[in-house]
């Protein structure tokens, strides 16, 4: 999928989802500024999804060496890398809803697979604090790991059905 097609798809989703999301947000009773940012949420979501389609290993290199250099025509109001990282949290819920909207339909034939998401090396388990109490030791076909296990269910067309 090209960047333009991806943006159109995400922006169409955002146009429908934003009304629902605004209605469901809790009101604090205090007056709050509702000033629009430089980047629309659909642009932030597009850049995050497009990162996974590119062959960059880390997000900082992708944003500073690709987005800020080659995508300035497509996204004229880009923010700095540090500000973009702060904005990611604001689109987490819409991004999860977008993922859920992209799920396929069950066709009768489904495949399930799992992959480990290691959070640290096995030697560092006693010093690990980020996911302390949440992450656990696990085993896959290759070795032991400390972290989480991601399970994916796909149909025979390669469409995502569920994850856990």
Language model features with spans:
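Short alpha-helical elements
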Residues: 1-164
